Amino acid sequence: MERIKNFTSSKMDHCVHMFVNQLNTLRSSRASPSILDTILIDYLGQKIQLKKLSNIIVENVNTLRITLFDPKIKNNVEKAIISSKLDLIPIFINNYFQIKIPVLTEERRLQLIKLAKKMAENSRICIRNIRRLSNEKIKLFLKDKIISSDKERRLQHEVQDITNSYMEKINVILSKKEKDLLK
């Protein structure tokens, strides 16, 4: 029965991890290399993440520096950054791109918060689906007489406790991101 709890926790952990990764792609007013995670570059006939083709560092609070491993892809990188919906403009200086992160408008901040809330709700749905799967497995064990009805209720209660803790994690992470976006 520990297997069910471990299954539930590991799958819910994955949902939270995916949520955090999604939130990291939302840009705030501060420069962060993770805002470029979704940018894909045409390289040798494949779409490859920019971070795998370059070194991305934070130059200062509102500036990123992108140093390409292969300078021949300069035009592809520039095109990909401009065509992304991040409102970023790359400037090529010497052998690197410099990207100034513009200050977010109040309207854009509210849009990003709304998007973050939608991502949080999708993560909550993921967690509830995992809870449902775990409860179905528990009911199957009861049906096959592997566990008693008392054990079934106890396991379902434990699965619910695990679910509640992961829902709280989602809420805490969302709250931190909202505060970050409102700065």
Swiss-Prot record:
Responsible for the release of ribosomes from messenger RNA at the termination of protein biosynthesis. May increase the efficiency of translation by recycling ribosomes from one round of translation to another. One of its GO terms (biological process) is cytoplasmic translational termination. It comes from the Bacteria. It is found in: Cytoplasm. Belongs to the RRF family. GO terms for cellular component: cytosol. SUPFAM superfamilies: Ribosome recycling factor, RRF. One of its GO terms (molecular function) is ribosomal large subunit binding. The keyword Cytoplasm applies. Keywords: Cytoplasm, Protein biosynthesis. This is Ribosome-recycling factor. InterPro entries: Ribosome_recyc_fac, Ribosome_recyc_fac_dom, RRF_sf.
